[in-house]
A protein has these predicted regions:
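ABC family nucleotide-binding domain
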Residues: 4-208, 212-215
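Conserved switch/coupling elements of ABC/ABC-like ATPase nucleotide-binding domains
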Residues: 217-223
Length: 223
């Protein structure tokens, strides 16, 4: 399928007072188009930091990130905003839905921000496949945690991003809903050829991925 994402020698250090933490140390790997990759590691191993850098939400101290061959770690301002709108989807652990919008309006929002045409048939299929058709007109406080995370997944998939990043997407869910969400991401990768990079501490969830990258002792992760 060809390479879609590449990290080269990514390093990141944080400092809090006199304490210096090396979150990432020369981290390098690549992801193929349509691949579902799970990044696993203990708490504090740097996996969420890595995800934020890959998604352009944070910058590395050293190293480069490429998406579809474009070096993104140096993008700024309007170019960075445009890149995120066109290329990146992100699923958060806490859903991050807007409480004043219905499920359908939440899914529409990134399309409107990016000035993308709304494919109503595609959205209806997404809602049906994710099992949230009945939630279409509900507000977030009227939905369960599992339903809210499915809406968040629909929102991320609606723009057809080059890469979909998921940061502990099952962290706030019970075991049944967690497995359901992991299975949904796996199907999205297989059915739509969606490239997905998921961070998780749960090895059982990671088993749904095509490939698992392990981060050990806040050091390096290599392909």
């Amino acid at each position: 399928m060809g390479e879609i994402l590449r990290a080269e020698n990514i390093s990141k250090t944080y400092q809090a007072g006199r304490v210096v933490v090396k979150a990432l140390n020369r981290c390098s790997f690549s992801v193929e188009r349509g691949e579902f990759v799970a990044v696993v590691g203990r708490s504090g191993s740097g996996k969420s930091t890595l995800l934020r850098i890959l998604a352009s939400f944070d910058k590395p101290d050293e190293g480069k990130v490429y998406v579809e061959g474009e070096e993104i770690s140096g993008l700024k301002g309007k170019k960075l905003a445009q890149f995120r709108q066109e290329k990146i989807g992100f699923i958060y652990q806490d859903y991050s839905l807007f409480p004043e919008y219905t499920a359908y309006e939440n899914v529409l929002l990134p399309l409107k921000i990016a000035h993308q045409a709304v494919d109503k048939e595609q959205l209806e299929r997404l809602f049906e496949e994710l099992g949230i058709t009945d939630c279409r007109e509900r507000y977030p406080d009227e939905m369960s945690g599992g339903q809210k995370q499915r809406v968040a997944i629909a929102r991320a998939l609606a723009t057809r991003p080059a890469v979909l990043f998921a940061d502990e997407p099952t962290g706030n869910l019970d075991a049944e809903n967690a497995e359901s969400v992991a299975a949904i991401l796996s199907r999205a990768s297989m059915r739509y050829g969606q490239t997905i990079v998921m961070v998780t501490h749960d090895r059982q969830m990671a088993d749904y991925a095509d490939r698992i990258l392990s981060m050990e002792n806040i050091v390096a992760c290599m392909k």
